[in-house]
Amino acid sequence: MTTTLEQLRAGQLAGTRRLTLADGLSEFPREIFDLADTLEILDLSGNALSTLPDDLPRLRKLRIIFASDNRFTELPEVLGQCSQLSMVGFKANRIREVSGKSLPPLLRWLILTDNEVEVLPPEIGACSQLQKLMLAGNRLRALPEEMAACSRLELLRLAANQLDELPAWLLCLPRLAWLAYAGNPFSEALAASVLIDTPIAAIQWNALELEAQLGEGASGVIYRAALSARHDEASRPVAVKLFKGAVTSDGLPDCEMAACIRAGDHPNLIPVVGKVKDHPAGAHGLVMELIDPQFANLAGPPSLESCTRDVYREGMRFGLASVLRIAYGIASAACHLHRQGVMHGDLYAHNILHGAGSEQGSVLLGDFGAASFHIADNRDFSDALQRLEVRAYGCLLEELIERCDGLDANVDIAAKLVALKAHCLSEDIGSRPLFDDIAAVLRPLSGAGDRDTAALAAV
């Protein structure tokens, strides 16, 4: 909840652990230090700040600081003196300089999205607790080799920078599971060729009638719409995603659109009907099949506390049959994507739609905002990327197993799932299976082989 400076000055916030101030501040309010004994989370986003006070470490319990959408041109060095600070968020400033002195010793999560950073300090390699690093929309031309020591790094966003290559050591980080790098010079040509070379229907804007807004994310807004048909046919319900065009924490909307198009058809992906043509404001958009409202997200996104792991509804449980179908469906979809030269980059339960009611057991992988492209024929590179994403899949499988009913009564299946999870999460990257290996293990367990046989027999 946003509070006011007047409330702070009146002493109404004594004892608070979380403070949010967005009052057009150009200077750090000294009254914040009255909360030094309790304040843990400080959010100063959406102000006009360019500096922080030298005595910021007086906030001795401060764990998290947000200062996005301000006027900082450098990451304040005083942050490095805050002994308990683990999360630092300075998105959408004008930051060019990041000093090694600005990195706190317990840094776990650093957000520098949409700034002007050209160089990261070598001291980042000493951030032994670093798990999540958000750098999309900067001017980085290289990464410091010292980052190879960041053995706990799990999620890395590098999209929309100036990188000419991914360093070899990056794909050797033992816990890296979620990577996005689209919109860099070394990958731009692949994304551009998708938009030119991949066949997709063009749908005139005037053939669409927007109805209710279904949702909004960082990259765009999704609407329910009616797609006009020929005069002798009724219009059909569809979903339309109109992209915003600005850089997001994951990357560029144009790259997301290209990935959706390149993904093609698969039973566990949301079908794309076509690309919007002749929008009056020139906006880019996709027309997709409308998903049955019985589908819901499998989980919520990570919290400030969980950092890289999704948050499930309390008490949420899955039957064994559902777990097997989800696990197989997502492995099959990921295998298909990598064959198409697409790495999803955000393979998480919160990006998976799970059916209920008549759709029970059905599963769809969505949200391509962090997707990146690779040449599938470059086996060494593409296999390395795939094994990286297999670790993300292992995290998903671990979460499903933890919430699965019926394992005690199916000891053999339980043993196979636990062993598969362990292989996917192995820090010996070369020993991890590829997605087709995973699908081969799960296909007979999930009954997918029987369904495939039945489908072929019906043809």
Where are these regions (language model features)?
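The feature captures the LRR N-terminal capping module
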Residues: 1-54, 58, 63-77, 81-111, ...
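ATP-binding glycine-rich loop module of kinase domains
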Residues: 220-258
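Structural motif at the C-terminus of the N-lobe alphaC helix and the adjacent alphaC-beta4 loop
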Residues: 258-269
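Short beta-strand micro-motifs within the conserved protein kinase catalytic domain, predominantly
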Residues: 271-284
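Conserved short submotifs of the Hanks-type protein kinase catalytic core
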Residues: 281-295
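Activation segment signature within eukaryotic-like protein kinase domains
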Residues: 326-327
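Catalytic-loop of the protein kinase fold
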Residues: 334, 338-356
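C-lobe/activation-segment region of protein kinase-like
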Residues: 364, 368-419
